[in-house]
Amino acid sequence: MNFEDKLEEGLSLLREGDYDHALDISRRLQNEQPDYADGFHLEGLVFQKLNQWEKSIDALEKAIELENERSGFYNLRGFANLQLENLEKAREDFEKAIDLDDSPAAHRNLVLYKIMSDKGNEAITYLLDRIRNNPKDVENWILMGDLMQRAGQSAKAKTYYQQAQKMDPENEYVKEQLAEM
């Protein structure tokens, strides 16, 4: 089995929740190709699923050392830092991911950073701008629905969820949110 096939197997195991075997594969990949970032990336993903944020950061830092132009590495490290409440490190990583390729996931995580930094109004304004600039990104509509719901604005939340449902009728999360309203 070549490197790419092993990597795909590790990612498949990760999706299935078999974290021990996915971690084993990540370590094998690192041993086989220590100059490739993907083995360390897989390790970082596994540790995120296990909520082992420091270990995830360590693995992602190694991945970034090897390949510093992949926005996903910065976004994931930023998310781990957000979980540890290292807010400024998280912000820097999200902004780097955005600078690299305008990562939609990093934009959403930057909204979470703003909320955790007690900048709720700034977060909402930022997300509304994202919706205006990219109205086809269903995840932005969902996140705005979540923010409105948490703010006690059920009617507004419902309109955001309904728009998300028009865009992605099979989205289970949106169906659940609308069913609870």
What are these regions (language model features)?
Residues 34, 68, 101-102, 135, ...:
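Short coil turns that delineate tetratricopeptide repeat
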